[in-house]
């Protein structure tokens, strides 16, 4: 295939008022078999390797841990932390930044209530955080960092901040990627492929920027491989036999299941933070959790089966 004949164009672009963006792209003139190869590679890179920004910790005046209650605030700490995960941020710097909030009730707190440095922009300022139902004052300090994929709150880091409650952070700016491959005939009646890619982002990056950045990451990856000398020593080949398979669900946060508040809080209080943690529980063991009833269990079972094809045994 002559790469100079490849054609890529954006054939659809949409932006939702609350922030998310959607784009559809067409890559034409591909040889047979190349559509699915490029589609799979782009999808993995777009979902796993692009950099994003998220709140990674909070310090709340008068609060010691995530199981505390804040006087005069409708939500508990776990609900507030869950709401904070929905705030979409865009940063002009990779450095750690801090934001602050100080508000006296009664008041409804949204993302726009947070005071941020000029390098940080809130994409969805109307996103709900909490409600102060009395005249109490709520003070929160936010730790904001950049990264890729997601990071669990219970992962240990040497630079943890004292008095901060660490939060699960989703850095991924691309929320969803779909693609399909179609066969077409060129002018010489030869079968060619065209690749249609659909990209949804959280609004901190456009689909056009996402596919451009993802393509460059792939190019640089293969460029670095091509510049290295291949080591054919037998020791290196033997080492590959000792690589242990990784459970694909081990590090997926339970927030990805998008459970309702009650079962989510029960799981978090039981220190069930990932799908891997959840898979350690049988249905009977789950029902033994405090305040975890049959309705919550049925929701968890159904969500695991419908989203991941997993059935607890």
From Swiss-Prot:
SUPFAM superfamilies referenced in this protein's UniProt entry, alphabetically: C-terminal domain of RNA polymerase alpha subunit, Insert subdomain of RNA polymerase alpha subunit, RBP11-like subunits of RNA polymerase
Gene3D superfamilies cross-referenced by the UniProt entry: 5' to 3' exonuclease, C-terminal subdomain, DNA-directed RNA polymerase, insert domain, RNA polymerase, RBP11-like subunit
SMART domains (UniProt xref): RPOLD
Annotated EC: 2.7.7.6
Catalytic reaction annotation: RNA(n) + a ribonucleoside 5'-triphosphate = RNA(n+1) + diphosphate
Domain of life where this protein originates: Eukaryota
Subcellular location: Plastid, Chloroplast
CDD domains referenced in this protein's UniProt entry, alphabetically: RNAP_alpha_NTD (cd06928)
Primary location class: plastid
GO biological processes: DNA-templated transcription
GO terms assigned for molecular function: DNA binding; DNA-directed RNA polymerase activity; protein dimerization activity
Region of interest called Alpha C-terminal domain (alpha-CTD), as start-end residue ranges on this chain: 243-313
Keyword GTP-binding: no
Region entry Alpha N-terminal domain (alpha-NTD), spans: 1-229
Alphabetic keyword roster: Chloroplast, DNA-directed RNA polymerase, Nucleotidyltransferase, Plastid, Transcription, Transferase
InterPro entries: DNA-dir_RNA_pol_insert (IPR011262), DNA-dir_RNA_pol_RpoA/D/Rpb3 (IPR011263), DNA-dir_RpoA (IPR011773), RBP11-like (IPR036603), RNAP_asu_C (IPR011260), RNApol_insert_sf (IPR036643)
Subunit-level organization: In plastids the minimal PEP RNA polymerase catalytic core is composed of four subunits: alpha, beta, beta', and beta''. When a (nuclear-encoded) sigma factor is associated with the core the holoenzyme is formed, which can initiate transcription.
Domain comment quoted from the record: The N-terminal domain is essential for RNAP assembly and basal transcription, whereas the C-terminal domain is involved in interaction with transcriptional regulators and with upstream promoter elements.
NCBIfam families xref list: PRK05182.2-2, PRK05182.2-5, rpoA
Function recorded in the entry: DNA-dependent RNA polymerase catalyzes the transcription of DNA into RNA using the four ribonucleoside triphosphates as substrates.
Family in the record: Belongs to the RNA polymerase alpha chain family.
Protein name from the UniProt record: DNA-directed RNA polymerase subunit alpha
Organism: Thalassiosira pseudonana (Marine diatom)
Gene: rpoA
């Amino acid at each position: 295939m002559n790469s100079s004949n490849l054609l890529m164009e954006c054939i659809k672009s949409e932006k939702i008022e609350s922030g998310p963006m959607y784009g559809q792209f067409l890559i034409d003139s591909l040889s047979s078999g190349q559509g699915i190869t490029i589609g799979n590679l782009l999808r993995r890179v777009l979902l796993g390797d692009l950099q994003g920004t998220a709140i990674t910790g909070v310090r709340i005046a008068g609060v010691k841990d995530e199981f505390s209650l804040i006087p005069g605030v409708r939500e508990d700490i776990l609900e507030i932390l869950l709401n904070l995960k929905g705030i979409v941020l865009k940063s002009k710097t990779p450095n750690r930044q801090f934001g602050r909030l100080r508000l006296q009730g009664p008041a409804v707190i949204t993302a726009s209530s947070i005071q941020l440095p000029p390098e940080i922009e809130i994409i969805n300022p109307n996103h709900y955080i909490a409600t102060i139902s009395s005249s109490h004052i709520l003070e929160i300090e936010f730790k904001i960092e950049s990264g890729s994929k997601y990071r669990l709150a219970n992962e240990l880091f040497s630079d943890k901040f004292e008095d901060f409650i660490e939060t699960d952070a989703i850095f991924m700016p691309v929320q969803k990627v779909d693609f399909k491959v179609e066969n077409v005939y060129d002018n010489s009646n030869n079968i060619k492929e065209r690749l249609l890619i659909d990209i949804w982002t959280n609004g901190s990056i456009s689909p056009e920027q996402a596919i451009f950045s993802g393509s460059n990451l792939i190019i640089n990856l293969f460029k670095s491989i091509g510049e290295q000398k291949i080591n054919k020593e037998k020791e290196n080949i033997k080492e590959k036999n000792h690589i242990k398979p990784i459970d694909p669900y081990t590090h997926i946060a339970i927030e990805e299941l998008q459970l309702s508040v009650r079962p989510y809080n029960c799981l978090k209080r039981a220190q069930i933070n990932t799908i891997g943690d959840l898979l350690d529980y049988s249905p009977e063991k789950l029902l033994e959790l405090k305040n975890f009833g049959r309705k919550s269990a049925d929701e968890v079972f159904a969500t695991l089966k419908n989203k991941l094809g997993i059935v607890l045994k």
